[in-house]
Amino acid sequence: MVEKRNIFLIGPMGAGKSTIGRQISQQLSMEFFDSDQEIEKRTGADISWVLDLEGENKFRIREEKIINEITEKQGIVLATGGGSIQSRKTRNRLSARGLVVYLETTIDKQLDRTKRDKKKPILQNKNSVKSFLEKLATERNPLYEDIADLIIKTDFKSAKIIAHQIINTLFKT
C-alpha cells in the first residue's frame, strides 16, 4: 500500500501540472486541488480577472493563503500556480508538508500548450509571449529547482506516463 503523502506539483504554465495532478490523484485515490481553480471558485471570477483587479502583490497574498490552507490537508495532490513559488512562505510550506515535483518544460512546449488559453491575457499578445516566458523562466526556474524533491521533464510524454513515472519514483518499495 502506498503511503498517501501530499504531492505538490510546481512548474511554469503549460507544464501540465493540472492534467498530471488529476492523473496522479486518480491513480492513488487522493483528493486533487488546483490553486488557480480554488481561487476562481472562492472569488467567483476567472483567474485573469482576479489578477488584473487585485494586482500581482494582492493576488500573491491571496494565493499564499489558499495554498497554506490546502497544504494543511493530508493525502492530497496540489497543482500550484506557476508564480506561487515566488513566496518564500509558500516554498517553505510546500517543502515541509509534502513531496514537491517540479514539472519542467521548454519555452517552445509552453507556447504550444498555452496558445489557445483565453484565461491568460499575456498569452494573447503573440509578439511578447516568448520573451515574457523566457523572463519568467529566468526568475522562477531556480526557485522551482531549489525546493523540488523530484524534477520531471514533461515535453515528450503523455500525462498518464508522467503520472506513472512520478508515482513509481516517489513511492519505490
Swiss-Prot record:
Its cofactor is Mg(2+). One of its GO terms (cellular component) is cytosol. The gene is aroK. Transmembrane segments: none annotated. Keywords: Amino-acid biosynthesis, Aromatic amino acid biosynthesis, ATP-binding, Cytoplasm, Kinase, Magnesium, Metal-binding, Nucleotide-binding, Transferase. Catalyzes the specific phosphorylation of the 3-hydroxyl group of shikimic acid using ATP as a cosubstrate. The lineage of its organism: Bacteria, Pseudomonadati, Pseudomonadota, Gammaproteobacteria, Enterobacterales. It comes from the Bacteria. It catalyses: shikimate + ATP = 3-phosphoshikimate + ADP + H(+). It comes from Wigglesworthia glossinidia brevipalpis. Belongs to the shikimate kinase family. Its EC number is 2.7.1.71. The keyword Transcription does not apply. ATP binds at G14, A15, G16, K17, S18, T19, K120. The keyword ATP-binding applies. This is Shikimate kinase. It is found in: Cytoplasm.
